[in-house]
């Protein structure tokens, strides 16, 4: 479960890209990839058009769901999810407040899987935040998708070892 603020930019981009990488590895039928937000401020909105644009430009156009419905993570989603991938330290803190204690070990920041990034000190997880493209333009969305694509293979490798 990829998690961002409103479930219209980073988390749906992560969902689409991770699903693509799992399918490429032949694991698509064993892994269910979803996305959600920690806020309901964008409730019912589609994926941000700027995110859709960069996804199409990168070749994911056929994989963009037409029925995306931005939402805050639900109790049912929490119960059925084995891995939570918040995009930022702020998302991680908000998510941890929502989770029962038995689920907290299943929370790993998205970029924490990148072996090329230094492991942040406790309390400084924001050092590996995925860039927030919301207030930016095309460049910020390209940086965000670069960061998501860069880490996706490492997440897929890690999950494959857990299966």
Stretches found by the model and what they are:
Residues 1-163:
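Short polar/charged helix/loop
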């Amino acid at each position: 479960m990829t998690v961002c603020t409103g479930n219209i930019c980073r988390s749906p981009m992560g969902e689409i890209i991770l699903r693509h990488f799992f399918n490429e590895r032949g694991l698509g039928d064993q892994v269910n990839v979803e996305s959600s937000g920690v806020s309901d401020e964008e409730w019912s909105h589609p994926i941000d058009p700027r995110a859709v644009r960069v996804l199409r430009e990168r070749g994911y156009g056929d994989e963009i769901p037409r029925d995306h419905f931005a939402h805050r993570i639900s109790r049912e989603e929490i119960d059925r999810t084995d891995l939570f991938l918040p995009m930022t330290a702020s998302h991680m803190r908000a998510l941890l407040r929502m989770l029962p204690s038995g689920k907290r070990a299943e929370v790993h920041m998205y970029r924490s899987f990148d072996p090329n990034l230094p492991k942040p000190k406790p309390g400084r997880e924001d050092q590996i935040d995925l860039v927030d493209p919301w207030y930016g333009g095309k460049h910020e969305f390209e940086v965000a998708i670069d960061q998501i694509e860069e880490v996706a293979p490492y997440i897929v490798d890690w999950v494959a070892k857990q299966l």
